[in-house]
Amino acid sequence: MDSENQFSWGYWLRHHCRCVAGEDLASHFPRFAPSREIAVAVNGDVIPVLQGYLQRLAETSNGRGLKRAAARKLLRATNLLRHAEDNDWPETLEEYASRVVQRFPQQQLAIGWLLQQCHTPEDDTAHFTARLKALMRWLDEARR
């Protein structure tokens, strides 16, 4: 594996994949300590990925699954805002929401809405799209 993929695929293989047949590739990687570098490697593509979801959403009449997936991607990507001294990973969507609201209390309502969309997306696609785009802009600005 290229060294440039160590913090994305290496981390993913070591901590999130289970071998079901053949060689266990996880054994080729050390345990990774939680870090911003890993968060960037795993979530750094959040804006183009979400733009892809929004494009697909505009082309379908039943986008409930896409809305749910987009909301989850965005909420998990808030891990990009972690501090260097953070020494663990959020495990649940609720933990992601709680952590980002602790750091950005002014986003409490927006993050609460996003968490709700992770479980039961609203039917109004135009409203969903507008709010998701606003949160995408906020995340993009907050991580600079």
Language-model segments: residues:
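Conserved nucleotidyltransferase catalytic core and NTase-mimicking acidic/glycine-rich helix/loop elements
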Residues: 30-144
